[in-house]
Amino acid sequence: GVSVEIPLQSYFRLNAPGAGQFEHTLIIVDEGADLHFIEGCSAPKYNVANLHAGCVELFVGKNARLRYSTIENWSKNMYNLNTKRAIVEEGGVMEWVSGSFGSHTSYLYPMTILKGKDSRMEFTGITFAGKGQNLDTGAKVVHTGENTSSYINTRSISKDGGISTFRSSVMIGKNAKHSKAAVSCQSLMLDD
């Protein structure tokens, strides 16, 4: 039942040319607890490619709440391939907030399993793809518990030939009675 008043923060910086970063973040928010976690990511620009392949595992307990916020502003030589997963128990709330503004190529597709009755998930994402960038973002949710709800809400901006791709998947299992889901994606292309 602990509520953490001040957000926990982490910052990942890849500081060497031709290097890879493979961090693993594990967060367990136990029954009745509340946490906001903020993750920042960046790297200086090098003349060779770099790789970020992070892994995030999140567990949201009964009647707990977790907001996981990510701001990614990688340099244009970065390949950013993340794996982010969450499991939410009864009455739990998972909130994803994602800002993707950098990298040469990104694939960001967090997945949430709404396992417990009355659990819910919300994903809010903003993506900006400029010259030479290919950013593939979105979210996936699997409803397995009764009376679960999810909302995926994204906005993207593409400029100077940048490519922004949105994908989402919503699966409602046979035992997820009275569950509901909504997906909203809006894109703005600033090229002629």
Regions found by a protein language model. Give the residues of each.
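Conserved beta-strand/loop scaffold segments within soluble protein domains that form the structured core
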Residues: 1-192
